[in-house]
């Protein structure tokens, strides 16, 4: 898209105008965007047209190569970081003479599968629709586009939008002959939607090149009320399936009831010993390692918009757990969720039978200072205290006869990782929040942590590098579902936010 070498000469030779105010950056970048809306959307649509499921290796590489070319066209030193068995990471490097800080921006270019049957248009045929649902011809876009229009395609919001917003912000700065105030790094992953199985190894293999003062995670939607959001942490996660056993085959409940142990009854009592109805985890020692929220985190949580009453109405809930605690306060605590229970049958399939086994699937959300290994140890000790003999595979007949109560525990090792949280008073993290608010021109939401889990701890690393999240997509974007979309105004806002982050001067 335009001005490829001019900026390199003017901005980095020291001839550019330095130190623009946040207002100047926002207004100038906005004017640039208004002049180039068709080109921006067309370039975005080109990227969205390439299928991008993480396991589709040929198309994943096509995505990576297009992104790499896109950044090289902006005079960003770009290469593909690769290790065996992993999709390439697109890594961009832009050093600024005199800059003392390095900031790395993360996004991912892979997307969820598109098996959902109710896509209005094909997921890899990007379609721009006006608010009334009518399509806009991408081949003949008007000079100015309705900001409430939406671009429909897989990964329009999750998570290719930050990539096109970043390159457009670079274009706008180049056109204005302004240079960034920090050294910039760009890290675009190709397997986030399948759990980032190679991320740890890749970060280790390229540790020297990836040294940075701050990571900015550009993924996810803004707050539900439309406010811009900056988050400072995520919860960790681990999960397991527990299977308990009764007779070695189903038994007639009339002939054997009150005599043969019922595994469904055993399982429900075991689960009841682990969690109460107010979300309190009853496993001894579970809270011993939990780091309590800091006063600054509690203050930030209290200042977040409280939409609990509306959410309750929307969800048809007359009560919530741990009343009167707010949703945001509860998200800073560990949690035990029972994902599902299987055993016997119900409805028309029900029979008067004592089942031979019953299984529960459980996930834990962890907070700082907790580790998956520590939680596993506590859970297994608790199960044993309840009288169970723990096995790792279905018991044979000898094991059944030797132990009156048996539990098979199967942990999810690949999907387990600790929590991560950057202090909300960290100067670099505060700088990000301040810039986002300046660019937004309105009060933003600062969240000490999100309720979900991503491997943010890998970016923190042993150096405890600050990590903050700056989600940019509209909250109603249908990510992971049919008709995923990005509201154009969210894209326009993202361009301004990135320009502000590139040019804002972090305090020491």
Residues of each region from the PLM?
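An extended, acidic, His-containing surface patch that forms the Zn2+-binding/catalytic region
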Residues: 224-225, 282-357, 368-382, 386, ...
């Amino acid at each position: 898209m335009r001005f490829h070498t001019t900026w390199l000469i003017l901005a980095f030779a020291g001839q550019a105008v330095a130190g623009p105010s946040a207002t100047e950056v926002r207004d100038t970048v906005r004017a640039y965007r208004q002049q180039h809306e068709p080109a921006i959307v067309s370039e975005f649509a080109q990227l969205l047209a390439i299928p991008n499921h993480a396991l589709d290796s040929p198309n994943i590489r096509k995505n990576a190569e297009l992104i790499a070319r896109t950044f090289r066209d902006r005079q960003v030193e770009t290469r593909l970081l690769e290790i065996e068995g992993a999709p390439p990471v697109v890594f961009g490097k832009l050093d600024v003479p005199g800059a003392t800080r390095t900031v790395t921006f993360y996004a991912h270019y892979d997307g969820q599968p598109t098996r959902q049957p109710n896509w209005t248009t094909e997921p890899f045929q990007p379609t721009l629709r006006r608010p009334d649902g009518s399509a806009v011809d991408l081949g003949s876009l008007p000079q100015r586009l309705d900001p409430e229009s939406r671009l429909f395609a897989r990964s329009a919001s999750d998570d290719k939008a930050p990539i096109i917003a970043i390159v457009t912000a670079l274009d706008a700065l180049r056109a204005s002959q302004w240079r960034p105030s920090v050294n910039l790094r760009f890290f675009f992953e190709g397997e986030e939607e399948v759990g980032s199985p190679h991320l740890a190894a890749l970060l280790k293999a390229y540790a020297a090149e990836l040294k940075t003062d701050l990571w900015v995670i550009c993924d996810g939607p803004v707050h539900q009320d439309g406010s811009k959001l900056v988050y400072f942490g995520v919860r960790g996660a681990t999960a397991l399936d527990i299977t308990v056993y009764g007779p070695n085959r189903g038994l007639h409940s009339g002939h054997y009831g009150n005599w043969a142990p019922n595994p469904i009854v055993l399982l429900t009592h075991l689960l009841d010993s682990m969690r109460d109805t107010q979300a309190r985890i009853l496993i001894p020692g579970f809270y011993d390692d939990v780091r309590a929220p800091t006063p600054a985190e509690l203050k930030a949580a209290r200042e977040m918009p409280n939409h609990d009453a509306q959410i309750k109405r929307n969800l048809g809930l007359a009560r919530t757990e741990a009343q009167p605690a707010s949703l945001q306060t509860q998200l800073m605590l560990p949690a035990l969720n029972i994902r599902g229970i299987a055993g016997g049958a119900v409805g028309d399939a029900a029979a008067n039978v004592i089942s031979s086994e019953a299984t529960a699937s459980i996930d834990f959300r962890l907070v700082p200072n907790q580790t998956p290994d520590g939680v596993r140890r506590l859970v297994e000790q608790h199960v044993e205290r309840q009288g169970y003999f723990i096995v790792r595979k279905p018991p044979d007949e000898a094991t059944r006869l030797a132990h009156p109560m048996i539990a098979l525990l199967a942990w999810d090792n690949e999907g387990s990782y600790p929590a991560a949280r950057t202090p909300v008073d960290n100067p670099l993290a505060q700088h990000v929040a301040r810039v986002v608010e300046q660019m937004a021109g309105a009060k933003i939401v600062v969240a000490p942590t999100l309720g979900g889990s991503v491997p943010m701890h890998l970016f923190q690393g042993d150096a405890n590098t600050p990590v903050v999240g700056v989600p940019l997509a509209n909250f109603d974007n249908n990510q992971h579902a049919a008709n995923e979309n990005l509201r154009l105004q969210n894209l326009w806002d993202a361009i301004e936010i990135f320009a502000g982050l590139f040019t804002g001067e972090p305090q020491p």
